[in-house]
Amino acid sequence: MMNMQNMMRQAQKLQKQMEQSQAELAAMQFVGKSAQDLVQATLTGDKKVVSIDFNPAVVDPEDLETLSDMTVQAINSALEQIDETTKKKLGAFAGKLPF
């Protein structure tokens, strides 16, 4: 059985690795796209919006609802990518906890 000191060292090591993975994730950028790529939203791994780009074809002053819907779709797409990558990157730590 592991003694308490070894468990603490292992936990500290895992914490440092997890913090490094979180920093790497935050530095990554994810691009979400709406249908037909008419709206693209770029977010960082820590879910901050970097940019939202609109194809001129989607900008219709008479139909702002479609533009709004496509913007939401693009942002949600990027958020899904972030969540999937987060699970892959940080989920591995769950099985390594010493307790």
Curated annotation (Swiss-Prot):
This is Nucleoid-associated protein SP_1102. Homodimer. The keyword DNA-binding applies. One of its GO terms (cellular component) is cytosol. Pfam families: YbaB_DNA_bd (PF02575). It comes from the Bacteria. Keywords: Cytoplasm, DNA-binding. The keyword Cytoplasm applies. Binds to DNA and alters its conformation. May be involved in regulation of gene expression, nucleoid organization and DNA protection. It comes from Streptococcus pneumoniae serotype 4 (strain ATCC BAA-334 / TIGR4). GO terms for molecular function: DNA binding. InterPro entries: YbaB-like_sf, YbaB/EbfC. It is found in: Cytoplasm, Nucleoid.
